[in-house]
């Protein structure tokens, strides 16, 4: 697949283990131009350490705190000015406090609930609002979800609720933006060791269960998920919108 001449925004790279980095690697190999958003200078420094691993020269890095509406608007205005327009966006932003990802869901705090839903779900809506203003015809948006948004899973708690809201947002955004020719989809990735997953209680047992019960008897990696994101952002997926595509070695089909 050749994506030369296409420009994509990648949101959510924390380090080399990030799923967003897997998508960046996949898109880079296909010749795409990448624009990265980061939360703050600490994440900028982490990103700059690994950018040299990519084949292309991707030098546009824009600060964007998704909890700040004015900063989101300013970030996409800057991206539009520097690129002339984008062809797609990957949203891989989620957060819940570590205490919220252990024990019982009934112990979720009001503040923890608000933060998780704001950062993990509402952020897709506000990002889409501003991304659409600089999106070229036939553009695409992809976000990241997890099976815990469909099923109750131990310790995932408020993040599962946030992912359920995110998946519903994908469908409503697909309807909303479809008339502008913009597609919106989600990839439901299997468990992967990332900075975010390290906060989930007893994460090792989740990985072990996938190896034992998934049809492929193994876990997936960042690049496998990244390749799927690249597919959804490309014209090869031009007829797909409002979809949640599972990349989890088939685990989601198991009873």
Where are these regions (language model features)?
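Short C-terminal tail/terminal secondary-structure segment
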Residues: 230, 241-255
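Canonical Rossmann dinucleotide-binding motif of NAD(H)/NADP(H)-dependent dehydrogenases/reductases
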Residues: 2-36
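Rossmann-fold cofactor-recognition segment
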Residues: 51-70
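Conserved SDR Rossmann-fold cofactor-binding beta-strand/turn motif
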Residues: 183-193, 233, 246-248
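Short, small/polar-rich loop/turn modules that mediate ligand/substrate recognition or access, typified
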Residues: 178, 183, 240-242
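A conserved structural motif in NAD(P)-dependent oxidoreductases
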Residues: 214-225, 236
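A glycine/serine/threonine-rich, flexible loop-to-helix segment
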Residues: 49-50, 179, 189-214, 254-255
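Catalytic loop of short-chain dehydrogenase/reductase
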Residues: 12-25, 94-133, 137-179, 191-193, ...
């Amino acid at each position: 697949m050749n994506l030369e001449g296409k420009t994509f925004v990648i949101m959510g790279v924390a380090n080399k283990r990030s799923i967003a980095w897997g998508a960046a690697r996949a898109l880079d190999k296909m010749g795409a131009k990448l624009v990265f958003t980061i939360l703050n200078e600490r994440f900028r420094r982490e990103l700059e350490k690994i950018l040299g691993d990519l084949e292309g020269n991707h030098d546009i890095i824009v600060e964007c705190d998704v909890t700040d509406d004015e900063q989101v608007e300013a970030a996409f205005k800057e991206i539009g000015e520097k690129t002339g327009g984008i062809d797609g966006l990957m949203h891989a932003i989620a957060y819940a406090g570590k205490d919220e990802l252990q024990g019982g869901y009934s112990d979720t705090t009001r503040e923890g609930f608000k933060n998780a839903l704001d950062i993990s779900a509402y952020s897709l809506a506000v990002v889409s609002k501003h991304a659409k203003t600089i999106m070229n015809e036939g553009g695409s948006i992809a976000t990241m979800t997890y099976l815990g948004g469909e099923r109750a899973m131990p310790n995932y708690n408020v993040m599962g609720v946030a992912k359920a809201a995110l998946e519903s947002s994908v469908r409503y955004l697909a309807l909303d933006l479809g008339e502008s020719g913009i597609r919106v989809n989600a990839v439901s990735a299997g468990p992967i060791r990332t900075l975010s997953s390290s906060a989930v209680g007893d994460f090792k047992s989740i990985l072990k269960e996938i190896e034992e019960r998934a049809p492929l008897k193994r876990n997936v990696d960042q690049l496998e998920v990244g390749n799927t994101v690249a597919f959804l952002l490309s014209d090869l997926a031009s007829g797909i919108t409002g979809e949640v595509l599972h990349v989890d070695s088939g685990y989601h089909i198991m009873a």
